[in-house]
From Swiss-Prot:
Residues 1-96 are annotated as: Large ribosomal subunit protein uL29. Specifically binds a DNA inverted repeat sequence (IRS) found downstream of rpsB in one of the ribosomal subunit operons (for genes rpsB, tsf, and unknown gene x). Might be involved in regulation of transcription of the rpsB operon; the IRS may be a control element to attenuate transcription. CDD domains: Ribosomal_L29_HIP. Residues 129-254, 311-339 are annotated as: Disordered. Forms homomultimers. Part of the ribosome; radioactive IRS binds to purified ribosomes. The keyword Protein biosynthesis does not apply. The gene is rpmC. It comes from Spiroplasma citri. Keywords: DNA-binding, Ribonucleoprotein, Ribosomal protein. Residues 145-156, 171-182, 217-238 have a biased composition (Low complexity). SUPFAM superfamilies: Ribosomal protein L29 (L29p). This is Large ribosomal subunit protein uL29. Residues 97-339 are annotated as: Unknown.
Length: 339
C-alpha cells in the first residue's frame, strides 16, 4: 500500500492496465483448465481496488487523473505465459521429488519383508536407536532390561552366536553364516518355553480345581420357596438348578360352584326387575326417569322436495334478464339544486 502511494498517476494508471490484463489472462486460463496460480486472482483484485482508491483520493485533492496510458498487451500476455510455465516446472519438480522419496521408502519396506522376521526386527531396532538421541537411548535400555530379566532360564542354556562360530573354526570346519542359524535357535527356545508355560498353567489349574471341589460340593441350606444352584466342578460350565415345586391350589368343590351359580341368578333377576316397561329404567336407590316420547308432527308443515320448483325459478330469471329498471328523473337530470 505504501509503495502504491509513492507512485505517480501515470505509473498507477499503467499498473492498473497491466493488472487488469493479467487478471483477464488468468481467468482465461481457469476457463481452459490450465490455471497454474489461482491465488494470484485475489491478489490482483485487491491491487486494482487499492489503485482506484488512491486515484480517487488524488482526484479529490485537485490532481489531474484524466490521463490515457497505452499498454502493449502482447508483452504482458507473453510475460504471464512465461511466469506460469516456470511455476509449472517448479511444481512438477517438487512432485517428482516427493514421488521418488515415497518410492524409496516403499523399496525399503519391501526389502524388510523379504528378510526373515528376526533380521527385520533387528534392523528396525537399529534404525530406531540411530534416530533417537543419547538421552532417549538410555531410557530404552532401562526399559529393555526388565524384559530381558523376564525371559525363561531355558534360553540361557543355549550358547551365543559368537561361541558357536568359534567352536566350529577351532575344529577346522568352515563356519556357516550366522544369520541363518540364529533364528533357528530362537525358534526352538520359543517352542520349549511355550511347552513349559502350558505345563505350568495346567498344573495350577488342576491344583485350584482340587482345592475348590469340596467347597463347591457342600450344599448351602436355603429357605423354602427360593431356587438353589449347586455347582459340581469349577471347570464345567453346567449347573444343576433345583426349583421348588409350586403348591397346588385347592380345587373348588360342588357346593361352592352351586353357591356361585345361585348368586349370579339372583343378580340377573334383580337387574330384570329394575327395568320397567314404558321406556323408564329403574335402578336400586336411583329413581331416575327417562322420557322417550317424541314430539308430534305439525299438520300444517309443507313438504318440499329438491328441484320441484325449477320452472318457477327459470321464469323468474328470464323476466329479470328481459326487463330493465328505468332510472328516476331526479337522479338523471343535472340541476343547480334550486327549484
Amino acid at each position: 500500500m505504501n509503495d502504491l502511494t509513492k507512485k505517480s498517476v501515470e505509473e498507477l494508471k499503467k499498473l492498473e492496465e497491466e493488472s487488469r490484463a493479467e487478471l483477464f489472462a488468468l481467468r482465461f486460463q481457469s476457463a481452459m483448465g490450465n490455471l497454474e496460480k489461482p491465488h494470484r486472482i485475489g491478489e490482483l483484485k485487491n491491487q486494482i481496488a487499492r489503485i482506484l482508491t488512491i486515484l480517487s483520493a488524488r482526484k479529490n485533492s485537485g490532481e489531474n487523473t484524466a490521463i490515457n496510458v497505452k499498454v502493449n498487451l502482447n508483452e504482458t500476455y507473453a510475460k504471464i505465459e512465461k511466469e506460469s510455465q516456470a511455476f509449472a516446472k517448479q511444481r512438477k519438480a517438487k512432485i517428482e521429488q516427493m514421488m521418488a522419496e515415497q518410492q524409496a521408502a516403499e523399496g525399503k519396506m519391501a526389502n524388510l519383508m523379504d528378510l526373515p522376521v528376526n533380521d527385520a526386527m533387528d534392523l528396525t531396532e537399529e534404525q530406531a536407536v540411530v534416530s533417537t538421541p543419547t538421552g532417549e537411548t538410555n531410557g530404552l535400555d532401562e526399559q529393555k532390561a526388565p524384559v530381558a530379566a523376564k525371559k525363561p532360564a531355558a534360553a540361557k542354556d543355549f550358547p551365543k552366536q559368537k561361541d558357536v562360530v568359534e567352536e566350529k573354526t577351532a575344529t577346522g570346519k568352515p563356519a556357516a553364516p550366522s544369520a541363518k542359524k540364529a533364528p533357528v535357535a530362537k525358534k526352538d527356545v520359543a517352542q520349549e518355553t511355550k511347552t513349559d508355560k502350558d505345563a505350568a498353567l495346567k498344573a495350577l489349574i488342576k491344583e485350584k480345581a482340587a482345592a475348590k471341589k469340596p467347597a463347591a460340593k457342600s450344599k448351602t441350606s436355603t429357605p423354602s420357596g427360593k431356587t438353589t444352584v449347586t455347582v459340581k466342578s469349577v471347570t464345567s460350565a453346567k449347573a444343576d438348578i433345583e426349583v421348588p415345586k409350586e403348591t397346588s391350589k385347592p380345587v373348588p368343590t360342588k357346593t361352592v360352584k352351586k353357591a356361585a351359580e345361585l348368586n349370579a341368578k339372583e343378580k340377573l333377576v334383580a337387574i330384570k326387575s329394575s327395568v320397567a316397561m314404558g321406556g323408564t329404567a329403574k335402578e336400586p336407590g336411583s329413581g331416575v326417569k327417562i322420557d322417550l316420547e317424541l314430539k308430534a308432527k305439525d299438520p300444517n308443515a309443507k313438504e318440499y322436495t329438491y328441484g320441484t320448483n325449477w320452472k318457477e325459478n327459470r321464469d323468474k330469471i328470464l323476466t329479470a334478464s328481459k326487463t330493465t329498471k328505468k332510472a328516476d328523473d331526479k337522479t338523471t337530470k343535472k340541476g343547480t339544486g334550486k327549484k
